[in-house]
């Protein structure tokens, strides 16, 4: 037994893909039986044809300003509330909830996912109990990295809010991403927290990874943007705060704490233990900082450490060492 019929009335939906303008006739869904919280006779959104909304399951398009077209499908128990646009072979299934969302161009949304006031575009899969909230933009694109087949994924219990996630990035576990920009093949997972604000985002790019209980926290001053790039990793209980740029093959772990600025760490540097780094500091070329070591540049001064050396124990450095002093 069908749960809805299509209206005799049609509505022309004008849309544009690149420079190509198109018009698609849509028809409104009208419930023909009571199911879930939908009463017989209730009018819903507009679809291109019956393939857009499954006749079985509890799925429904609640808002009369929602549209589903261009090969997109809604199935299972999925719900669309507030005006939503689902198009271009996007597939919404399971117990998903779309609320004021736009999903298109091959995106797959399944399981118990929530997409609220956000857009998802491109060949990606968002599943599990993941949430994408508060004007986030998910823009998937394959082929921009050496891995031609990897697709963007957000899954498990990950939450993305006020953020942009693009290319082939991966966010999963219990990760919380707020006011951040994640691109290329970057990964954020476990219980990592990225906490930007309305002035400064957190950036994780290239093949960088943030995981464990690590935290990246943006400040409110100009350029107080924590940035992790290339193949660098921030892990365990490390905290990176403010104007910090982490570049090539850097590992920050333990309970290390970095507060810029600005701080730049580059080229196979390892920072772990309970190390503390703050102020205007440049560390590069295979330096290891561990234990309770402190690198602290006072206001108006800067520190530059480079070359193969280990700073450990309770060492405290407040100025650039003389050549050969370490």
Language-model features and meaning:
Residues 1-58, 64, 77, 89, ...:
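Terminal amphipathic alpha-helical/low-complexity segments used for targeting or macromolecular assembly
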Residues 62, 69-70, 81, 97:
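Repeated polar recognition positions within modular binding domains
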Residues 71-79, 83-84, 89:
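A detector of tandem-repeat and repeat-rich interaction/domain scaffolds
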